[in-house]
């Protein structure tokens, strides 16, 4: 398996084993994209709900309590099929704490299977859709492959862009340039 970017090692541990099993089942059933969509929906709920994060991370809840609570949430959210069964199985096996990593590992496996390279892009403020497409096109030219962008807004960059793709990183942020100038000025004294 590819060790692509910072998510590569996820495919080696518990998260990777669960994600690989889910991916293989989804592939065999022709449901890879449906499962990804449902996992993304659950991941969005997870990021938005402090109560769900507490349920997932806390060892104080029994497997039965976690399974029941997650089952009710999945029903309300309309998450069903293989993804729902996978999430419930994770709860029943006391592996719910690893679910965020399992979801990331599943995404990585899907990208790998489709030949898509992941790029983490940090900018100071949200760019327009046209700028995002220009960034994607530039990264596609470099990677010689389709690129999936994870966009992060980081006002501390002041301006510019930081791109991490695989083991390569380009920092063209204004913050880094100002720090370089500051360092050069200190050395010139």
From Swiss-Prot:
Family of the protein in this entry: Belongs to the ATPase delta chain family.
GO terms of molecular function: proton-transporting ATP synthase activity, rotational mechanism
Membrane topology: Peripheral membrane protein
Entry function: F(1)F(0) ATP synthase produces ATP from ADP in the presence of a proton or sodium gradient. F-type ATPases consist of two structural domains, F(1) containing the extramembraneous catalytic core and F(0) containing the membrane proton channel, linked together by a central stalk and a peripheral stalk. During catalysis, ATP synthesis in the catalytic domain of F(1) is coupled via a rotary mechanism of the central stalk subunits to proton translocation. This protein is part of the stalk that links CF(0) to CF(1). It either transmits conformational changes from CF(0) to CF(1) or is implicated in proton conduction.
Keywords from the UniProt entry: ATP synthesis, Cell inner membrane, Cell membrane, CF(1), Hydrogen ion transport, Ion transport, Membrane, Transport
Places the protein is found: Cell inner membrane
PANTHER family: ATP SYNTHASE DELTA CHAIN
InterPro entries documented for this protein: ATP_synth_OSCP/delta_N_sf, ATPase_OSCP/d_CS, ATPase_OSCP/dsu
Protein name: ATP synthase subunit delta
Species of origin: Methylorubrum populi (strain ATCC BAA-705 / NCIMB 13946 / BJ001) (Methylobacterium populi)
């Amino acid at each position: 398996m590819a060790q692509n970017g910072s998510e590569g090692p996820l495919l080696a541990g518990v998260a990777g084993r669960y994600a690989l099993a889910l991916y293989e089942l989804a592939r065999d059933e022709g449901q890879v994209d449906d499962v990804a969509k449902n996992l993304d929906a659950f991941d969005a709920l997870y990021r938005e709900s402090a109560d769900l994060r507490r349920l997932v991370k806390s060892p104080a809840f029994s497997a039965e309590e976690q399974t029941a609570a997650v089952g009710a949430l999945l029903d309300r959210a309309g998450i069903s099929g293989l993804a729902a069964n996978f999430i419930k199985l994770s709860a029943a096996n006391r592996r719910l704490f690893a679910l965020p990593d399992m979801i990331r590992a599943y995404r990585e496996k899907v990208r790998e299977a489709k030949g898509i390279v992941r790029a983490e892009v940090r900018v100071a403020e949200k760019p327009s859709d046209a700028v995002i497409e220009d960034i994607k096109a530039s990264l596609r030219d470099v990677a010689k492959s389709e690129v999936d962008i994870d966009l992060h807004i980081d006002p501390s960059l002041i301006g510019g862009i930081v791109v991490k793709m695989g083991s390569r990183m380009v920092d063209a942020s204004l913050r880094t340039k100002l720090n370089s100038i500051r360092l050069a000025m200190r050395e010139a004294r």
